[in-house]
């Protein structure tokens, strides 16, 4: 392993396998002409640090572990790689992407469709909470790429509507969450149905040691493109805490903050569905315009809320961690942790909502006396310092 500071690394230090070279431009990756057109039409000019290292390795067929910060183009890293290796003449599933949430799976589908705009690519989002008949119809028609959640994908494979014999690549996005206890068995279920030579790509902002250890079960001699853990807290995101003496005082603190700030768009995180519903009602009673989302809402409702937020029709979204991983809304300038996350690794996914692709952002954590230990644990884990919020926080967001 060695530390590498190559093209577009923006001072991020990668602990990367020695054979990994840096491709400074997309042309240097020798991609299909139609794919290059899609990349430039999507708005990319040059590859990010993780893209310049990982895409070529994945396209060579190597099993790959790619770890980089939220907002650095991880989704495009594997999407471009998939589009390079599939054969669109063959209308069979050739790549499978598994994600922990329905929203993320749908977003990945839209990125693949956009990047593959000049390639006539078929990509279907195979997710729970949707009409199973639509899945069957789309899969029977033939999809080059399937982006889905583990439960529905496993179900479609078992029913033989998702045919796996042509699959050459499996991507596990947000792998730490996927491989947590909830999804582990479903991942193994899916993996058992894939051809033995299937290439595996693991992508995430955080890769705890136990996850890296577990990847040995289904990866062969993987190439690593890794960023050191203590580099993971996002550059460009200012982190603060507000000491709140009692839980009951958090709401007044939030209202005061809301009155003080001019917010483009903000996300407020709570730890439970019940808290999300309660806070949404309280904010509306106080005449604030907010929308909310959690995992137990019907999928159609979640889609509609996401659409409104993406289009800027709603400025503040209150959510559980279902929203914390990989959802890309460019205008988010502020994240408020109304509750500190119970899992310290979700902290980086939450605050990664603001300041994406080098934009500036602010993360504010509400901390009761019970939370001080959790805050210190987060600081230690990410080798970062979270300061008390200054009086002039409004200037930081302007």
Curated annotation (Swiss-Prot):
It comes from the Eukaryota. The keyword Nucleus applies. Residues 236-397 form the Helicase C-terminal domain. Keywords: ATP-binding, Helicase, Hydrolase, Nucleotide-binding, Nucleus, Ribosome biogenesis, RNA-binding, rRNA processing. InterPro entries: DEAD/DEAH_box_helicase_dom (IPR011545), Helicase_ATP-bd (IPR014001), Helicase_C-like (IPR001650), P-loop_NTPase (IPR027417), RNA-helicase_DEAD-box_CS (IPR000629), RNA_helicase_DEAD_Q_motif (IPR014014). It is an enzyme of class 3 (hydrolase). PROSITE patterns: DEAD_ATP_HELICASE, HELICASE_ATP_BIND_1, HELICASE_CTER, Q_MOTIF. One of its GO terms (biological process) is rRNA processing. A motif (DEAD box) lies at residues 173-176. It catalyses: ATP + H2O = ADP + phosphate + H(+). ATP binds at residues 68-75. Residues 55-225 form the Helicase ATP-binding domain. Pfam families: DEAD (PF00270), Helicase_C (PF00271). It is found in: Nucleus, Nucleolus. Its EC number is 3.6.4.13. A motif (Q motif) lies at residues 24-52. GO terms for molecular function: ATP binding; ATP hydrolysis activity; RNA binding; RNA helicase activity. GO terms for cellular component: nucleolar chromatin. ATP-dependent RNA helicase involved in 40S ribosomal subunit biogenesis. Required for the processing and cleavage of 35S pre-rRNA at sites A0, A1, and A2, leading to mature 18S rRNA. Belongs to the DEAD box helicase family. DDX48/FAL1 subfamily. PANTHER family: ATP-DEPENDENT RNA HELICASE DBP3. The Q motif is unique to and characteristic of the DEAD box family of RNA helicases and controls ATP binding and hydrolysis. This is ATP-dependent RNA helicase fal1. The gene is fal1.
């Amino acid at each position: 392993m060695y530390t590498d500071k190559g093209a577009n690394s923006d001072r991020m230090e990668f602990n990367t396998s020695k054979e990994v070279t840096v491709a400074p431009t997309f042309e240097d990756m020798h991609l299909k002409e139609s794919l290059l057109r899609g990349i430039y039409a999507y708005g990319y000019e040059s590859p990010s640090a993780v893209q310049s290292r990982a895409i070529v390795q994945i396209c060579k067929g190597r099993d790959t572990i790619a770890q980089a910060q939220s907002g650095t183009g991880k989704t495009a890293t594997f999407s471009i790689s998939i589009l390079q290796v599939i054969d669109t003449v063959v209308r069979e599933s050739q790549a499978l992407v598994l994600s922990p949430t329905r929203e993320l799976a749908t977003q990945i589908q839209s990125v693949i469709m956009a990047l593959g705009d000049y390639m006539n690519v078929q990509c279907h989002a195979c997710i729970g909470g949707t009409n199973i008949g639509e899945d069957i119809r789309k899969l029977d028609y033939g999809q080059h790429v399937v982006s889905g959640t583990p439960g529905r994908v496993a179900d479609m494979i078992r029913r033989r509507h998702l045919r796996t014999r042509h699959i050459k690549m499996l991507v596990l996005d947000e792998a730490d969450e996927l491989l947590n206890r909830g999804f582990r068995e479903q991942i193994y279920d899916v993996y058992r149905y894939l051809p033995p030579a299937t290439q595996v790509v693991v992508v995430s902002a955080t890769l705890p040691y136990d996850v890296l250890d577990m990847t040995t079960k289904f990866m062969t001699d993987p190439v690593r493109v890794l960023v050191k853990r203590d580099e993971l807290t996002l550059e460009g995101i200012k982190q603060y805490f507000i000491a709140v003496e009692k839980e009951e005082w958090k709401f007044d603190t939030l209202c005061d903050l809301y009155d003080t700030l001019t917010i483009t768009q903000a996300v407020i995180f709570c730890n439970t569905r019940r808290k999300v519903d309660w806070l949404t009602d309280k904010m509306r009673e106080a005449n604030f315009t907010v929308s909310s989302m959690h995992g137990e809402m019907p999928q159609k409702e979640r889609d509609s809320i996401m659409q409104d937020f993406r289009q800027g029709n709603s400025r503040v979204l209150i959510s559980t961690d279902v929203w914390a991983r990989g959802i890309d809304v460019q205008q988010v300038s502020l994240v408020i942790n109304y509750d500190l996350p119970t899992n310290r690794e979700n902290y980086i996914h939450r605050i990664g909502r603001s300041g994406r692709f080098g934009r500036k952002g602010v993360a504010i954590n509400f901390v009761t006396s019970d939370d001080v230990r959790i805050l210190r644990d987060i600081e230690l884990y990410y080798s970062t310092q979270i300061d008390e919020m200054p009086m002039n926080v409004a200037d930081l967001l302007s």
